[in-house]
Amino acid sequence: MRWKHGGPWVLIIIYNMIHHCSSGLERIVSFKLEPGSQVIVFPFIFEGYNIIALPTTKYSDLKKNPKDMKSLTPFFFNASHIIWDFAIGSVIRTPDNRFERLFNERMEGYLKDISVNVLKMYVKGNKTISELLEAVYERIFRCDEKGGGHMMKYIEDVIKGFDDMIENVPTEMDSERKEIYHRFWSGSRKYVESFYSIERLKHLVELEKMVCSACREICLGLKEEKLMGLFAEGSMRKALKAKLGEEEASRRGYLEYAIINDEILLDAHREHTGEVTKELVMQMLLGKNGEEIDRRYIGKVANVVKERQKRREREMEKSMKELLRDEEKAKSKKGRKKKSVGVSETKKEESETEEVEASEEMEISSVEVGGARRKTGKKSKGGRKCFKIHRRVLRWRKSPEKIKEELDRGREERWRGKSLEYIKEQKVLHDIAGVLELLRSEDADKFFMDTGEHSKGGSSRRRLMAIGVLEVGRRRMTGVVEAGTFKDSSGCTVLYHLMFRVTGIEEIGSVMSPEFAEANDIEKIDEDEECQDAGKFVYPKGVRFETVKDDDAFQIVWRNPSDTSEVLQGLTIQRRPYVI
């Protein structure tokens, strides 16, 4: 552990993916632990922007991807050293190297054996990454019934070493330096002594098991697109990028962590349901500072979880009532010989109730055949006042043949000479102008993330991203909706790029990065090209689509104009995760 005056500093370690040195580890970023605080490690393993192992990842999963297996090798062989550095810290250095020698004699081999044995368990038992992490914690901090154990004996020897340093102050020091010296070693002793407790070591293991379990449940309980939204929003890589720079950080492997008050989090886990613990972990993954989690915040999260459960119960009850009502109506129709001319007051009330409930839960606007928008009677309360659509986006409304003809004679080289089949595939991904309904609304920020500005070809551009699912026939594709914009000479926002990019969990980090946006953007935008006012946009005749927006998603459904019961294509854009 490297200490500075006033308290201990723990070093974040990363494992080097490129140069496999003896340990494969580098210590990069430092942070300070306050009294009562502890580091928790999330069972997600990253390489640069991308995630290469989830809490649920098994060895059998890795065998299918040799690249990830190779990237994870340094982690597997150094797992116990990594956890040691997070939980305890690296060895303090002295002129005589006494603590370094003590660590090498007592802990080096011990930790190596743990890494090897846990790796065997992971491979042969086909365990998950979260189970591997739990096993590392259990074995490092294991204590026997008498209160002994390898860890406790090592701490005893370290404390004795600190006592010797405190008692034998160098005689050549003046009074001021002696005071600093004494404060330094006394603080170091106090920190190490805090681990000389069976209860504290048990807390370390219990806390990590709780976090691993919550992360595992999050991965198992969320659909892929929801999980992608979680990783797209998270505060991953910030400390690493600040220290190493964007390019260097993108090549490193690491685990994410949080600093929390262990007593408060453990008490919350015991007092509340597992759903509350899971939500707390989710909020930390989204970027909530663990040190800001106090009892008041936990109470707030518990109330949110309780309200969410009540809402689900109400929705379930409502669905059951509707199902029973439909069954009763069906039976009633069979029992009647003649259709009733009038409508009872009761049925009128039921109909009115259904309409009110539907309007409360979702807003619906549809574009009929030929693009005639159904009026809702509501005026816009603001949002994006000036919004135009560039010709690059509008061209995808046309037939594949006309699109190909236009692209072949256009300025963008990457589109020239593409086959008609390829253009048809790209039309599916680019012809999603129904997204404009959401982009122009007040709720756009609830769905789209602003990934920042970049400059290319002499113009400043901005990119908005949203997680979504595109369904075409039986194909279901997860990915991101990309919207590229720039400001014209009048200051109006112009949409020059719109597409659905098929993306998985593993690549979501890279796709969200500024480098990806710049590398995949067109070189030059014809900013003088005539643009269409988004408010006047309509699809060509023969196209029918509907947009539906509720609390959690925005949906666009394209239907067969000849048979509106047939859905040709659907795009669902996920709402960004709730931050409490």
UniProtKB/Swiss-Prot annotation:
Bias type Basic and acidic residues, positions: 308-330
Positions with biased composition (Acidic residues): 351-363
Location of the region described as Disordered in the Swiss-Prot/TrEMBL record: 308-384
Biased composition regions of type Basic residues, renumbered to the chain: 331-340, 372-384
InterPro entries the record matches: DUF3654 (IPR022115), UPF0329 (IPR011667)
Family, similarity comment: Belongs to the UPF0329 family.
Protein's UniProt name: UPF0329 protein ECU06_0080
Gene source species: Encephalitozoon cuniculi (strain GB-M1) (Microsporidian parasite)
Organism phylogeny: Eukaryota, Fungi, Fungi incertae sedis, Microsporidia, Unikaryonidae
